[in-house]
């Protein structure tokens, strides 16, 4: 009995009036990691942009593991000193459905003598974990997934697992049809398809879609060659005939994919393919057929069942009948739940003696992770900058997802009603933090606990903390906070513990804070020389708050400036009066007479002196005048 039958030829049978119409080119971005300039690579001379949008890391020369790896000369690796989570944050990506592919590389340095093992996530969902030996397997030197990017960005992160530094050769973001690989119930924008394998069967070789001259809307898939499923298990077939119904919407398979095949033999009539998979996962299996065997010319000549992990998914498959003729593409799709570690596909002949297959695709179905509230992510990023958070923390990507790699020091909780993660705790004590605590911390509205003790944080305690009403524990002890305690802390009605000891705070503890704490919470204000006003601290009495001290200092300074200004004005006025009196005295009659007498006396003295001087000159020598 057929458990499920999703026939992709139903989509193909309309044959593509849609695909025959001109479509705009799909969005495509290729990044050559570590490169300082754009490059093109043969044989298609694809354009790779220089390295952009990375959060850190080190550029280096690259060693390409296999021949299918793009022939690029550089990579970017992320040493553990830069933190466990490093990302590429790519912006201005049009809303749509994408194939995202990341090629890995090996650092071309003697000190890097082993392949790194690490995890990869896209938009907060982990899609791949590298396994030992990946660098020698063609289909393991990259990770690929089909994902909807709806927020205008693509965040691709690499998570250290303690086995070497993640090293990335290239990143590709290639747009595909919005309905590509729709597998029916359960498919949608919240689903990611991770490529487990793609095989082209028969005499063909490993190729990309572009090698097949496939449609760009196919996403330039890589097809790994499968020459045989086992010794004496099959024989190859090939043709140069045109294949109908191949490169059509929404998947746009290349025609060349259907021009080779494997056919079972008399020794082993069943065609069997097995793939190692992760247990307790769902997989989407796509089987490709085209009747290219010259010995099969009519309906009923070749009929077989498709059995996956012991269950019959498709009964009485007759390719010619179902595709509409010879040399026509047929695609069958099934969703399979696998409890063990092996997925096995068996084609069991019922008529004609042999089964045939052209290509196989297997995807792991992954439910996209819920993301953290955007405002809270933004607030944490501003805190990271304001506090000078060391790079070893690796605060990149989403703080809560993937759940296997949350940010160190940030505690997360999922709100099932809104399907969003939020931050309910900060544990960053004794981490060498400096700088100041920004007002944006109040945007973490779900915080229940803040522990920033034993750092070197300066400045005032943000008054905005009073709006985080869920806060139960606030420990800012042994820092360098100064100024007064904000009165808004009295609005924290859920507060159980308040530790502000070991800082440089001053002024009176606000009544709203002290009164509530005396009755409901544990508190510690010691080792703040300027604090006063509650039991255990000096009485405020003559003590002045820092605000009052500033006010007094300002008043004294202003009074001094006024006194100086008045003194200068008085002095200038006095000078002007004296000058006016002198001028008036010279203009009086008695003053003129005295001036004439004085002038006559001076002239007489002057003449007498001149006479004496002339005589002395004659006596002393010849005159200089003739």
From Swiss-Prot:
LRR repeat residue numbers: 420-444, 445-468, 470-492, 493-516
Signal peptide: 1-22
GO cellular component: endosome; Golgi apparatus; plasma membrane; trans-Golgi network
Pfam families named among the record's database cross-references: LRR_8 (PF13855), Malectin_like (PF12819)
Keyword Glycoprotein listed: yes
Cytoplasmic side: 571-626
UniProt subcellular location: Cell membrane
Family matches, as InterPro entries: Leu-rich_rpt, LRR_dom_sf, Malectin-like_Carb-bd_dom
Region spans: Disordered: 603-626
Extracellular side: 23-549
TM segment ranges: 550-570
Protein's name according to its UniProt entry: Receptor-like protein 4
Protein encoded by which gene: RLP4
